[in-house]
């Protein structure tokens, strides 16, 4: 049951800081996205809504089995860091599908990739990256980019 006076917030994360989940489940479901730095990044975005009760947050994550039944939210927090990379098609397809289903405000920060300073090769999933960015442009007023290369998208 959610608190009706506070916003309902969807968060792209494998787990919330207030959850008690076993290490084995965290690792077997890759709820940290490959490294614990992802948790620091995603959890820091929760501070924007520190006055919202925990029951108003819903998590969605590519490695979680549960599927959303209700797509009615006030905000979708989308903390991404290294989204632009090879072999990330599954996550991009998941996020594109989700973005098409929601109508709430999207708060995106830190999108990009780990690019070298000299030269840049095109990714094989360039079309998915562009589709993802085009959807984001429709859903948010600003996109926080990680670097100059990401800004080119």
Task: Map each language-model feature to its residues.
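Aromatic- and Gly/Pro-rich donor/ligand-binding loops
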Residues: 2-142, 148-153
